[in-house]
Amino acid sequence: MPLQLLLLLILLGPGNSLQLWDTWADEAEKALGPLLARDRRQATEYEYLDYDFLPETEPPEMLRNSTDTTPLTGPGTPESTTVEPAARRSTGLDAGGAVTELTTELANMGNLSTDSAAMEIQTTQPAATEAQTTQPVPTEAQTTPLAATEAQTTRLTATEAQTTPLAATEAQTTPPAATEAQTTQPTGLEAQTTAPAAMEAQTTAPAAMEAQTTPPAAMEAQTTQTTAMEAQTTAPEATEAQTTQPTATEAQTTPLAAMEALSTEPSATEALSMEPTTKRGLFIPFSVSSVTHKGIPMAASNLSVNYPVGAPDHISVKQCLLAILILALVATIFFVCTVVLAVRLSRKGHMYPVRNYSPTEMVCISSLLPDGGEGPSATANGGLSKAKSPGLTPEPREDREGDDLTLHSFLP
């Protein structure tokens, strides 16, 4: 119980705005000695389960708690007036379906000392997603429409480190085995590639989840200029192609007149203008904040995915309409054939009647009957003969039992 109270006092100290229930259950199980000895940054451990990656290694070094700074800016921030709203919260779904809250401000991170010379270092595990470390001042909002701007707030000594010299241009270089390559013309100012072990793959699944993954060997150095905007422009015939792994399905290309401006002024806004005709028309604005998952800093993004009606939807609708039309034609042909056959059968019934007797048949049958008194005989015109013998009247009753009379009448 005293251990929990001491941990609560440390977490609720000046400069930390962490919730009580966020740390009571998760931080109580951690050892307090190593945390105090290393002076680590205290952070809550929501179960931010990732869909594809489950870290199973030891947690890395945590960041430092500076309790003498304000939640908005660090002691070495270049310009504190360009900070976006500090309490901008974003909600996303974790693997268990629970709604997790990710803030880009230092509310759930603790106060971070962000001097331009000493920045915090975040290392990612081999299965962790791409760790984008954020300064308190800039925040990243990647908007992929043509007029949108991407505000990246990254720390400078992390796996994706931003250094801010005065006249440096942004140069991102890679060995030949890089999996992601942004190729521009010789007038392009930036070539983004990764190390041989780098796997920064922007993969867009049917659920439209974009996961940017980089192993620890991937070191992406972004050097920014504080007073000038760096514009990455491509010629009309040059397009920016991000070649991903075999599982990657999203290709980001720039249109003819589109220019990708990576501006990291003191406000650290990076404008990524990309072609709106990317695969499946994904317009994915996301804001990245640095959170920890079981002690591992990782990039968590709020993916607000808009699905415009693209070409595959039109194709599927057209195919469905074509199938319905074919079935309707088959049903119509069947109905017409049925009506025609019914009409023809009814006309044949009238042309060929079932029974058509003539009086000659009756005459021929009656001529075979004997003239004796075996019943009344029919004359030529169908009348009955009146010649009867009174003595033979009882015999026809005996002979008429069954069909004997008819058989004897036809025999010679």
From Swiss-Prot:
GO terms for biological process: cell adhesion; cellular response to interleukin-6; leukocyte adhesive activation; leukocyte migration; leukocyte tethering or rolling. Glycans are attached at T57, N65, N111, N302. Residues 18-320 are extracellular. The chain crosses the membrane at residues 321-341. The modification Sulfotyrosine is found at Y46, Y48, Y51. Residues 56-95, 125-146, 166-252, 374-412 are annotated as: Disordered. Residues 66-82 have a biased composition (Low complexity). The modification Phosphothreonine is found at T406. Displays complex, core-2, sialylated and fucosylated O-linked oligosaccharides, at least some of which appear to contain poly-N-acetyllactosamine with varying degrees of substitution. Mainly disialylated or neutral forms of the core-2 tetrasaccharide, Galbeta1-->4GlcNAcbeta1-->6(Galbeta1-->3)GalNAcOH. The GlcN:GalN ratio is approximately 2:1 and the Man:Fuc ratio 3:5. Contains about 14% fucose with alpha-1,3 linkage present in two forms: One species is a disialylated, monofucosylated glycan, and the other, a monosialylated, trifucosylated glycan with a polylactosamine backbone. InterPro entries: PSGL-1. Sequence repeats lie at residues 122-131, 132-141, 142-151, 162-171, 182-191, 192-201, 202-211, 212-221, 222-231, 232-241, 242-251, 252-261. Residues 342-412 are cytoplasmic. Residues 395-406 have a biased composition (Basic and acidic residues). Expressed on neutrophils, monocytes and most lymphocytes. The modification Phosphoserine is found at S409. A SLe(x)-type proteoglycan, which through high affinity, calcium-dependent interactions with E-, P- and L-selectins, mediates rapid rolling of leukocytes over vascular surfaces during the initial steps in inflammation. Critical for the initial leukocyte capture. Homodimer; disulfide-linked. Interaction with P-, E- and L-selectins, through their lectin/EGF domains, is required for promoting recruitment and rolling of leukocytes. These interactions require sialyl Lewis X glycan modification but there is a differing dependence for tyrosine sulfations. Sulfation on Tyr-51 of PSGL1 is most important for high affinity L-selectin/SELL binding while P-selectin/SELP requires sulfation on Tyr-48. E-selectin/SELE binds with much lower affinity and requires the sLe(x) epitope, but apparently not tyrosine sulfation. (Microbial infection) Interacts with enterovirus 71 capsid proteins. This is P-selectin glycoprotein ligand 1. It comes from Homo sapiens. The gene is SELPLG.
